[in-house]
């Protein structure tokens, strides 16, 4: 039995679905099943390649706070989704990654259609 890393599986799924009509939406829904907390927010992955992801979150009642703007944790969560997917997609198939921390700064209220974009380079992984 061979092991397929989550990043490899997601890249393969993206390659199969993204060219199809509605494929990005289907990929995003399947990703939401794999990551249920994030899936409840309903983000859509717009672009996915190793080290680069763009995800969209559309403002609606279920992601708003009492100030009638997108909740801060919804913003952080879609940012984490984009970052995690970019990192997972760039990692070698023999490696698994775990987020150990992140920091976010909020500069103003978020409203409307929001885009989270992550670009990263993964250093070479060695056994030592």
Give the location of each predicted region:
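Terminal targeting signals and extreme-terminal segments of soluble enzymes
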Residues: 1-128
């Amino acid at each position: 039995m061979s092991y397929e890393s989550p990043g490899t599986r997601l890249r393969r799924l993206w390659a199969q679905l993204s060219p199809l009509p509605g494929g990005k939406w289907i990929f995003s829904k399947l990703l939401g099943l794999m990551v249920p907390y994030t899936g409840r927010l309903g983000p859509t992955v717009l672009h996915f390649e190793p080290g680069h992801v763009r995800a969209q979150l559309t403002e609606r009642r279920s992601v708003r706070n009492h100030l009638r703007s997108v909740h801060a944790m919804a913003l952080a969560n879609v940012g984490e989704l984009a970052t995690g997917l970019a990192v997972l997609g760039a990692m070698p198939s023999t490696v698994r990654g775990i987020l150990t921390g992140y920091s976010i700064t909020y500069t103003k209220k978020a409203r409307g259609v929001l885009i989270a974009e992550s670009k990263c380079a993964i250093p070479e992984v060695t056994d030592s």
